Amino acid sequence: MTDKPTLHPRNRHQGRYDFPALIKAHPDLARFTITNPYGKPSIDFANPEAVRVFNRALLKAQYGVQHWDIPADYLCPPIPGRADYIHVLADLLAEDNAGDVPRGAQVRALDIGVGANCIYPLLGHSDYRWRFLGSDIDTTALASAKAIVQANKLDKAIGLRQQTQPKHILAGLLQADERFDVTLCNPPFHASREEATRGSQRKWKNLGKQDPKRKLPVLNFGGQNNELWCEGGEIRFVSQLVGESVQYAEQVLWFTSLVSKASNLPGIEAALKKAGVKALRIVEMGQGQKQSRMVAWSFHDDAARQAWHARRKSQA
């Protein structure tokens, strides 16, 4: 029996949350703070407004993000798990960089599906000072992300771009002269609206809050359709990303995606083999009851990846 993965060692969210520090950073959190059955301060994670205010406090206290908000009905992400993905990406880049995590604006990351919350660019820039380009098909999400970027004066660190061809992921998005050290993606994992609704209801029930007459809040469990589901579900989305990545093989060092369902891995690995990748990594991730993994692939062999890092250093 293997141990379940825990938070990455560099993750800032080890142990219990420091509620006094969070309330000091964002006093509005105090009105949502409750005492849990173990006598510890917490919030009602079934209350969307509480989750949003909690995230705002966490981003301010831990990451220096002074202004953060999202529109109603958009995903309110659990920050520790999102931070883990960033740290795993950093380890991936360190692998071919003599074990050193590359930092600074010379490192460029592409966040596919940046969302209204803009969470990955905020965390990645705060922890490693990387530059990000965030893409999305949703104009409302992009407007929200832009407001966050501008309010925090991060325009030089975080760019945003609309994918105007919603049936494509990379095609039509990237310019021929752009280079990215890594791409990241947290894909929609349901195959239909009905499946997504059932998933939200399961989470709601697990909190003991299910009420058939009550509309389910969507801030922390749901999101917009394109955030939650796509035709064919997670495996189709990631397989399409693999297929499209072939065209951009020379422009990106590592392509990556989260995969929530382990049963999808064989199909994704088959797509990667067909694409002719030179390197493949699967890294298990998890916190609490939620388990996931990052799949990463590159069309560059070991020597080419090391040369990529050397070129970036020479241009710094």
Curated annotation (Swiss-Prot):
CDD domains for the chain: AdoMet_MTases
UniProt key word Plastid: no
Cell compartment(s), UniProt: Cytoplasm
Catalyses which reaction(s): adenosine(1618) in 23S rRNA + S-adenosyl-L-methionine = N(6)-methyladenosine(1618) in 23S rRNA + S-adenosyl-L-homocysteine + H(+)
Alphabetical list of SUPFAM superfamilies matching this protein: S-adenosyl-L-methionine-dependent methyltransferases (SSF53335)
Function: Specifically methylates the adenine in position 1618 of 23S rRNA.
Sequence similarity: Belongs to the methyltransferase superfamily. METTL16/RlmF family.
Protein name: Ribosomal RNA large subunit methyltransferase F
Name of the gene: rlmF
